[in-house]
Amino acid sequence: MKIELNGIPDGLEVYEHTGSGYERTMHYGEWRVAFLNWAEKFDFSSDFPPERHMLTDEVFVLLSGTAVLEIGTDKKPVQLEPERIYNVRAGVWHRVKVSRDAKLL
């Protein structure tokens, strides 16, 4: 969600997502930036199905909390470390599981 802050110069936009789940927060042309916060579907106990995107890669950046990416048809777990970029290549099956305090970009 775009937020209005006092003192922000012209030409700068500020966005945040404080709710649960996934939100395509900002987009331009063919690219977008989204936040992912905890939601039941992303909980470690959830068994929601993996997904894949045939046309684009998908990037995950852990900002806080704990998150695991499960990669490939064998769902190999990868523990995410804060402030690292994890790029899931187009066509690769994946799903993410997060702690209740997690915030990902």
Q: Which residues are covered by each model-predicted region?
A:
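A short, N-terminal "cap"/entry segment at the start of jelly-roll beta-barrel domains
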Residues: 1-35, 42-43
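Ligand-binding loop in jelly-roll beta-barrel domains
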Residues: 81, 90-105
